[in-house]
């Protein structure tokens, strides 16, 4: 079986593709799996896919710039034509039995050409609000899988052939297999350590980073607290300089990195998580049952991260801190309250797992893809 995975831009599109690929490889060790992403250096696929050991092909495509009247958007029609040609060459050479797109601008040309050539083509949309690539491809794709039931309504219903289904978000195997005690032992954490895990997205988030620098400096005064923060590659050098100018810079319990590559271990070991409220982050928190302080990105379409965060808040499964309040010290205040209340952390962890976890998502996605191949 030959499978071509495509999706990218941010880790939120790449990681679902990696999780689906890992599930297929687990069931079919001899499966040949390759990826297609954009040629942009900032595309996280160019980092994460080779690390996972898969061949990676690239096409010359990028997302639409904001504002819409930006002169750089004049190049998009040319790039759309060029990338479709490049995708066609990749498909012709690889000859896939199945193409799976996980959203982001990078998946459009490959999925579009796969559909045109009659290759079974499936899409997965992790967010409640579907992105432009999925919106453009939904009517032609053979299968559209979603994480939220409401996404099907936003896509116009189940489609003419009932080809839209809810399956949940796929998770990397580590999120399902690693226990808290095993992860903490692996990371050298004791029972007395209170581990705070913090990240603002694969590319970084300036205001979140600034707030965590202040938080880390404060937490140096709490002896049993350990913090790991991923600042993102784009903002890392600036934050490293700020970090080193505070008490956090000389405190071994406060750690700063650009990106977390062993997220399943870190998430499993955490007592408290600080993160954005993207769909994949919420799914990871739910599957591992973690208390979380969510800082929704205000820069996404229709405030979908705020909606994700408030869904958790309304169930008592999370705390929301809006980005515009960060300069007021709201993050430090909320974290301090949760550190002081293990009971509240425990309740939040139980509720997010009970209300939002979808532990069989990988199996449902795999079964759906195999049914698609057999039906064609």
Where are the language model's segments positioned?
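Glycosyltransferases and closely related glycan-assembly transferases
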Residues: 86-100, 108-122, 135-139
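Donor-nucleotide binding loops and adjacent catalytic segments primarily
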Residues: 35-48, 180-185, 189-273, 306-310, ...
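C-terminal alpha-helical cap of glycosyltransferases
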Residues: 358-376
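An amphipathic, basic-hydrophobic alpha-helix
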Residues: 66-98
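A short, well-ordered alpha-helix in the C-terminal region of glycosyltransferases
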Residues: 344-358
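Conserved nucleotide-sugar phosphate-binding/catalytic loop shared by glycosyltransferases and other
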Residues: 3-8, 27-79, 167-169, 233-235, ...
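Active-site-proximal region of nucleotide-activated glycan assembly enzymes
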Residues: 34, 40, 55, 115-181
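Acidic donor-binding loop of glycosyltransferase active sites
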Residues: 96-98, 264, 268-283, 290-291
């Amino acid at each position: 079986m030959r499978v071509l995975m495509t999706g990218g831009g941010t880790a939120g599109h790449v990681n679902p593709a990696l999780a689906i690929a890992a599930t297929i490889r687990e069931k079919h060790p001899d499966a040949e799996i390759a990826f297609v992403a954009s040629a942009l250096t900032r595309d996280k696929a160019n980092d994460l896919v080779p690390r996972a050991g898969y061949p990676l092909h690239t096409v010359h495509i990028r997302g639409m710039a904001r504002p819409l009247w930006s002169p750089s958007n004049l190049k998009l029609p040319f790039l759309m034509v060029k990338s479709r040609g490049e995708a066609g060459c990749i498909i012709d050479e690889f000859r896939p039995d199945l193409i799976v797109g996980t959203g982001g601008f990078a998946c459009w040309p490959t999925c579009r050409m796969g559909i045109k050539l009659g290759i079974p083509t499936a899409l997965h949309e992790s967010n409640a609000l579907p992105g432009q690539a999925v919106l453009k491809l939904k009517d032609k794709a053979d299968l559209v899988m979603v994480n939220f039931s409401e996404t099907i309504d936003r896509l116009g219903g189940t489609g003419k052939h009932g080809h839209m289904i809810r399956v949940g978000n796929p998770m990397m195997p580590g999120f399902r297999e690693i226990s808290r005690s095993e992860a903490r032992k692996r990371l050298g954490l004791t029972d007395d350590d209170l581990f705070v895990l913090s990240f603002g997205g694969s590319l970084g988030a300036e205001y979140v980073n600034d707030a965590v620098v202040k938080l880390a400096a404060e937490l140096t005064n709490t002896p049993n607290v350990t913090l790991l923060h991923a600042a993102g590659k784009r903002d890392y050098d600036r934050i490293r300089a700020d970090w080193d100018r505070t008490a956090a810079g000389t405190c071994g319990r406060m750690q700063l990195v650009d990106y977390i590559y062993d997220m399943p271990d870190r998430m499993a070991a955490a007592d408290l998580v600080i993160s954005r409220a993207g769909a994949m982050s919420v799914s990871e928190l739910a599957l591992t049952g973690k208390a979380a302080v969510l800082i929704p990105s205000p820069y996404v379409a229709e405030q979908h991260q705020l909606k994700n965060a408030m869904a958790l808040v309304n169930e008592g499964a999370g705390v929301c801190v809006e980005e515009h309040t960060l300069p007021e010290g709201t993050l430090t205040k909320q974290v301090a309250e949760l550190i002081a209340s293990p009971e509240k952390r425990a309740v939040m962890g139980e509720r997010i797992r009970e209300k939002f976890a979808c532990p069989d998502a990988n199996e449902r996605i795999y079964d759906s893809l195999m049914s698609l191949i057999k039906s064609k």
